[in-house]
Design a protein with these regions (language model features):
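Extended low-polarity, hydrophobic cluster-rich segments
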Residues: 28, 32, 106-111, 140-146, ...
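Short recognition helix of helix-turn-helix/winged-helix DNA-binding domains
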Residues: 1-45, 56, 75-125
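Minor-groove-contacting beta-hairpin "wing" of winged helix-turn-helix DNA-binding domains
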Residues: 76-84, 157-168
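Short amphipathic alpha-helical interaction segments
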Residues: 52-66, 136-148
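Charged low-complexity intrinsically disordered patches
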Residues: 1, 133, 137-143, 147, ...
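The alpha-helix within a helix-turn-helix
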Residues: 47, 132
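A short, conserved structural fragment
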Residues: 65-75, 147-160
Length: 170
């Protein structure tokens, strides 16, 4: 997937991400990238970035408005979206993650997975089985991230390390 957005860093609230599914996390990230690029962005901009249907994104946006720092102003001809960056309990991810050649559910997983990293590091102290159990993803999603070279598993298989530059922002 290659997008026409300049690379930018987006701060994402950890408790919000932990409450989302992989698909919702992907949509949330793409929405924030669209807003960062163009404050007058619409739902169609998010549809163009994600490739997800407008109905699905609309349903996700309703949830984001309830649990996230996303505000939707419905007073004009079209909805206006704004985002308040978190000041604590956040991770920062670069929009270049969208340029990776992996499924959107893998990107959503990586966005959520970043929440479990050690403070000021790119290491997640979870084994594969704990990731599946605690984060609620399937083994093949984790293997897809490994095969794409976005994360690396330690030799003793006790932890994972982010290696893609978009995920290595501290």
């Amino acid at each position: 997937m290659i997008y026409d957005y300049l690379t930018m860093r987006v701060k994402l609230n950890i408790p919000t991400l932990q409450a989302l599914t992989n698909n919702e996390a992907f949509t949330y990230f793409c929405t924030l990238v669209a807003i960062s690029k163009n404050p007058d962005s619409t739902i169609k901009d998010t549809v163009r970035i994600t490739g997800v249907s407008e109905t699905t994104i609309f349903n996700h946006l309703k949830k984001f408005e309830e649990v996230a720092n996303l505000t939707i102003d419905r007073t004009g001809c079209s909805n206006k979206y704004s985002y308040t960056e978190p000041t604590k309990f956040f991770v920062t991810i670069d929009s270049s993650l969208l340029d990776t050649d992996v499924d959107r559910l893998v990107i959503g997983f990586l966005i959520r997975f970043k929440c479990w990293s050690r403070i000021a590091s790119n290491i997640v102290d979870l084994s594969l089985n704990r990731i599946v159990h605690e984060i609620g993803v399937q083994h093949n999603t984790v293997y897809s991230a490994l095969e794409a070279g976005l994360v690396k598993r330690s030799d003793k298989k006790l932890y994972f390390k982010f290696i893609h530059p978009s995920l290595c922002i501290l």
